[in-house]
From Swiss-Prot:
Protein family membership: Belongs to the bacteroidetes fimbrillin superfamily. FimA/Mfa1 family.
Pfam families: Fim1F_C, P_gingi_FimA
Known role: Putative component of the fimbrium tip. Fimbriae are filamentous appendages on the cell surface that mediate cell adhesion and biofilm formation.
Name assigned to this protein: Putative fimbrium tip subunit Fim1F
Subcellular locations according to the entry: Fimbrium
Propeptide residue interval(s): 25-50
Lineage: Bacteria, Pseudomonadati, Bacteroidota, Bacteroidia, Bacteroidales
Signal peptide segment: 1-24
InterPro entries per the UniProt record, alphabetical: Fim1F_C, FimA_N
Amino acid sequence: MRFNVVLFMLIVALLGGLSTCSSEVPIGFDTDELSFDMSLVLLTGDMQTKASDPNYTYATTEELTIQNCHVAVFDKDGKRIYFKNFYSKDLGEMKTIGNLSGYELQLEGVRTFGKEDKKVSVLVVANANNANNSPFDNLTTYDGVDNSYTAKTIAKGPVTASLLVKIGKSETTLKYNQDNAPVTVSLIQLSAKIEYTGVYKKENGELLEGFSLTKVAGLNASSKITIFNTSAVENGAFSDLAYPTTKPVTFYTYEISDAFKEVILSVQSGVEPKEYPFPANKFIKGNYYRIKGLKSSTEIEWVLENVEDKEVTLDPFE
């Protein structure tokens, strides 16, 4: 099921000031009257766990949070013509827009280098920036071998619910000297969410006390953002991440295609914890999973449940 963080809106109508932005101007262009202001509507899907917010079936407020955001605009050839970074001080407080939670932002002065209608693409990567800078600022194109977004690896473990990386893209046509409609960008969680629910008696489903999750190892802390090229796994990046005993029973991992990688749960019910492996390639971006044990008299059978089995597919840039 999709980590569709259901209809979480980010209507982009600038709060100004300390965010960073850049319009990248080709040599020889007259920049007078060749720019637009753009408003964005960011939609995030529902991540599946009971939430206090009545407008979301599962996602918690933390899982919907955006603490920073990188927005890039590309021309029809995939060359970046503009980017802007937003941080928490620029985003302001999450607010209600319609009956949904969101933020208001705006892109100012997007130069499109000509007065004819311009088709552009917008890419949004949320919660992937560093404290005071973005790993995307020096990139120049959407696709390619070097200095491109599709070649970029996000080396950041999705450790906390409030910093889950979200990504989305959209296309629009900008019309010169007109009010342009807000651009809608649907965001998806780049990680999968996993919840350990405990060990139960197999015969009657009764929760057994005395079993505790002490560690989770083998989680993927790195991902590329090439998820728009095809619905297949393309991240090709892996960085081992382990949750110590102080972490909760809900955790997150980026998708990985390597069939030999394993997510390993250490569960204690006596003096020594026992390790239980799960194939890491079973955990797909934008999905929510529950893991539970069913104990018979001799062994524990582990069940991996996809809360709602919906494929996450995203169209490529045209």
